[in-house]
Amino acid sequence: MSATRRTVASAGSIVVKIGSSALTSLVGGLDVGRLDALADAIEARMRAGSDVVVVSSGAVGAGLAPLGLTKRPRDLATKQAAASVGQLALAHAWGTSFARYGRTVGQVLLTADDIARRAQHRNAQRTLDRLRALHAVAIVNENDTVATAELRFGDNDRLAALVAHLVGADALVLLSDVDGLYDGDPRKGNATLIPEVNSPEDLDGVVAGSGGALGTGGMASKLSAARLAADAGVPVLLAAASDAGAALRDASVGTAFAARPSRLSARKFWVRHAADEQGILHIDEGAVRAVVTRRRSLLPAGITAVSGRFYGGDVVSLLGPEERPVARGVVAYDSAEISDILGKSTQELPAEMQRPVVHADDLVPL
C-alpha cells in the first residue's frame, strides 16, 4: 500500500464528499437505501476513532420529484426552488439514518462568500469545530437557495476541498459514480485506472469530462479539488460511492492523490483558493521575476496599470505582460492610491507610501 493510501486509511479527521448521483435516483428523489449504506460506512469509520465531516450533494436532485420535475433545471430560480425542497428532505434523511446509531446531525449551509470573507471563514470554522467537539455529524452543502451565480462554489468537489482545509482534515474522500481516475473515457472500454497520482506530471494526457445528468461535478472538478486539497497538505481518495466501505476502511480502492510535501500556510491558502479577487494589478516583466522567481514583495515601480475598484486588505490578481495571472495577493493600498504611485520608485514617494503594495508574506505565485 502506498504512503498516500496509508495516510488516508489512518487519518484521524476526514472530510467525505458524496455526489448527487450516489444519493438520488435517475428520475429525482432520494434513494434512502443508498444513503443508509453510506451512513453505515461513515459510522464504521467514526467508531474506528476518526472524526468525519460529510459534504453532501443532492439537494436539487432530491427536490425534483416532489416538484413534478423530471430533469435537472437549467435556470437558477428553478434550481433554487428545487434546492429549498430537497435540502429539507436531504437533512431529514441524513438525520434519520444516523439516528439508527444514536447520532445527531447538524446542517451547515455555506455560500462562497462564507469562505471568501475572513470573518465568515473563521465563523464557519468555529461552527464545524464545535459540532465535532459535541460529537454531532456535520452535513455540509452549498446554500443553493440563496447563492447567486456570482457567489457559487461551482460544485461540491471544490467546497469539500475548502472544508477539508477549513477543519484541518487529514484526508479528503470523494465518493461519486466513478471508481477512480482513468487515462481515457472508461465508458469506451479501453481506459486504464490510474491508481496513484503523486505529481502534476502524472496527469499528462488525462482527459476529464463533464458532470452527469443529476450533478455538476465531472472529473475536471474532481481533479481541481484534488489539486486544491494538495495545496492544503490534504491527500485525496477518489472512489465509487458503491465502494464506500472499502474507501473508508482501508483506502484500498479508487485513485489516491498525494498532498504536496509542504502545505501552504492557512493565510496563503486562503489568498490563493478561497478569497474572491476584487481587482487586478498589471505588472511588468521585472516585477514578475521579483514576485514569482525571487519571492519578493511587489513595489509600485513594477506596476503598469490598475483594473477595478478595491481597498487595502482586499485580494487582487497580478497579471504579467502577456495578461496571464502570475500571482494573487493582499494589497496594502486602495486602488485609487495605487493609481497615483504606480511606476514610481520607493525613493520618490512620501514615507507613509513606501510600504510594498503587496508584501511577500501576502503573495502567492500561481
UniProtKB/Swiss-Prot annotation:
The keyword Amino-acid biosynthesis applies. GO terms for biological process: L-proline biosynthetic process. Its EC number is 2.7.2.11. Coiled coil: none annotated. It is an enzyme of class 2 (transferase). It is found in: Cytoplasm. Substrate binds at S57, D144, N156. Residues 278-352 form the PUA domain. Its main location: cytoplasm. ATP binds at K17, S176, D177, T216, G217, G218, M219, A220, S221, K222. Keywords: Amino-acid biosynthesis, ATP-binding, Cytoplasm, Kinase, Nucleotide-binding, Proline biosynthesis, Transferase. Pathway: Amino-acid biosynthesis; L-proline biosynthesis; L-glutamate 5-semialdehyde from L-glutamate: step 1/2. NCBIfam families: proB (TIGR01027). This is Glutamate 5-kinase. It comes from Rhodococcus opacus (strain B4). The gene is proB.
